Every structure is written in C-alpha cells, then in structure tokens.
A protein has these predicted regions:
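Cytosolic, long alpha-helical scaffolding segments
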Residues: 1-220
C-alpha cells in the first residue's frame, strides 16, 4: 500500500469529515455525528500507517523505494500528514461542540432564539467548498511536482481573503444566536485553516521543485 495512496485516502476522509461537520449544524442527526467520529478514527489510522512507513524509510534511507527523489521528501510528507490529521481533528472538535449544544437543547437548558441564518450558512458552505478545492489542488500539485500549479494555489489563497472578510462582516452584521454564532465562527476558522494548509503545501512543493531543478543543473 504505497504511502502516496495512504495520503490521498487520508485527505478524502478528512475533507469528508470537515464537510459533514458543517452539514451537521442544520441536520443534527446522530448518524451524521457518528460519521464524523468514524472518519476521524479512519484518518488517524491511516496517519499512523503513513508515519510508520516514513519512519521505517528514513531509518534505512529507503527514499527511492518509497517513490521519493530525495530524503527531504520524508519531511514534506510528514508535514502533509500532520495537516490532514488536523483537518479531521478540527472536524471532530466541531462535532463535540454540536453534541454539547444539542444535549443542552434536549435537556431544555438552552433555548435557541432564531433559526440558522440561510445567507450566512450558504456563504459558509461556499467558502468551505473553495477551501476543499484548494487543498485537493495542493495535494495534486505535490504529487505531480507541478511548479506552476503550486504558484496558482498561492495566488488563489490570497484572492480568497476578501471572500473570507466579507463572510466575517456578514456574520457580524446579523443578530445571530450567540451559541450558533460561536459554532459558525469555529467552522469558518476550520475552513480558513484548510486554505492555509493548502498554501503551505504549495509553498513546500515550489521549494522542492526549485531544489530539484538546481540539483539537475549541478549534475549536468
């Protein structure tokens, strides 16, 4: 089971958990909550497998056997695995907050004043979709050693800052229930982090590609 496949699968699972954690705000079903918990466990298991493979490879200098061109790629993949684990962990944290909220509502310890604002929720889903797309592109660029693709990802991240600020202003302008507002801010922050992870992976891909090009010139 190649480490690249493990990382790909981890990313799919973690992003799915993140998406479900946002959907769970409107559909607070036990099944959806459990889906995020299960996904977090699956991502963790794959993460442990990937780390063991990396540790085994670096101890025996088996970078070529793992499909790497230089030993430095061990660190790159370790960072990516950490980022993906953080995505699933943040999704689980959101679900834990929603579970606490729902329990307080069920026990009538808490009364939500208003329904979820559709405009805010729709824009949050849109921002989250952009975050997912950016992260998926960063993983593809890393695997393909795509220098130009990595550059585009960094530019896109900068362009999404305005969209993020607009969403923050929209949330601030609305009279949201404080409990719902806190969870919405958590979800927005999780989406922003995914974009930052994508940017970091793209920057690492750029650095790796430049180093490989320079090395090839030195050899010639």
């Amino acid at each position: 089971f190649p480490i690249e496949n493990a990382v790909r699968r981890m990313a799919v699972i973690a992003l799915s958990a993140n998406r479900d954690s946002i959907l769970a705000l409107k559909n607070r079903s036990k099944e959806l909550f459990q889906s995020v918990i299960n996904a977090h466990h699956d991502a963790n298991r794959l993460g442990l497998y990937a780390v063991r493979q990396l540790k085994f490879g670096i101890e025996r200098n088996l970078f070529r056997e793992l499909g790497f061109r230089t030993p430095k790629e061990f660190l790159l993949y370790r960072i990516v695995v950490n980022n993906i684990e953080s995505i699933s962990k943040n999704a689980l944290n959101t679900i834990n907050n929603l579970t606490t909220l729902q329990k307080q509502i069920d026990e009538q310890l808490l009364f939500i004043k208003d329904a979820i604002d559709e405009e805010v929720y729709t824009q949050l889903l849109t921002f989250n979709s952009h975050a997912h797309q950016l992260f998926e592109e960063s993983i593809k660029a890393m695997f393909k050693r795509d220098y130009f693709g990595a550059e585009k990802i960094i530019t896109k991240r900068e362009n999404f800052i305005q969209l993020e600020n607009e969403l923050i202003r929209l949330m601030t302008s609305k009279k949201l229930d404080p409990n719902i507002a806190a969870i919405l801010r958590l979800m927005l922050d999780n989406s922003r982090r995914i974009m930052e992870y994508a940017k970091n992976i793209a920057e690492l891909t750029l650095n790796r590609t430049v180093e490989e090009i320079c090395t090839s010139f030195e050899i010639k």
